[in-house]
Amino acid sequence: MRKKILIALGILFAAGVAFAAFLSYAFSPTPDFRRNETVDGVRMDAVVAWDERKPIIRTFREKDYRALTENQLATMRDTVDGGIEGDIPCIKLNKGPKMFFQFEKAEKPVKPEKISIKILAHAWGDDDPEKTRIITDVLKDEGDLGFSYTTKRYSRQYEKYFLEYLQAEVHYTVDGENYISTFGTFQGNGDDGTSFFENEELPAPVEPE
């Protein structure tokens, strides 16, 4: 009988440890080693100005990305938008809204032969009738520093403090192969420490820039 009790206690202890580990993982920021997954040795690094947090980047061959099912796309998008609040960077619209990009293959810097960006801008509130806007554009070549892109407000603004979510897709070609690297970032006009609970409704909505 005593042996059975000890076995039961051991099982309960192991289950408790496993559950605690699961909670710790589920409510922790995405670890660095999972923030940038590559393919064919091709890697894109992205930096959001004024924010030291690294985005969560997933890189695909273009043909593989196009072949993803809706469920696979949903899982990928859920990954790049972060595991917990504060897990991904936020572009500061009132402080120089820039993103910077560099590329490498086999751990050596490379310059893509072709490059463009596609942004899916998701309105934060329910008021905006257009929930998602799609923006396609070119990136600025910064020479040896890579490429940059300046964002702007893409959704309709109803309150003093504004926030929206962007899923960026960078389309580029390296050694004749087409790739897509995608990541998520927020962007808003609030300074550090801004409380959105103290927001104020604007007299009239402000249209996207």
Set out the residue ranges of the language-model regions.
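Short, aromatic- and glycine-rich surface loops/edge beta-strands on solvent-exposed regions
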Residues: 159-175
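Short, solvent-exposed, Trp/other aromatic-anchored flexible loops in extracytoplasmic proteins
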Residues: 91-109, 138-163
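N-terminal export/targeting and maturation segments
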Residues: 21-81, 152, 182
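N-terminal Sec-pathway targeting helices
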Residues: 1-16
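Short, surface-exposed loop motifs enriched in S/T, G, D/E and P with embedded aromatic residues
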Residues: 41-43, 129-143
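Short beta-strand elements
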Residues: 30, 103, 175-209
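Mature extracytoplasmic domains of secretory-pathway proteins
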Residues: 61-135
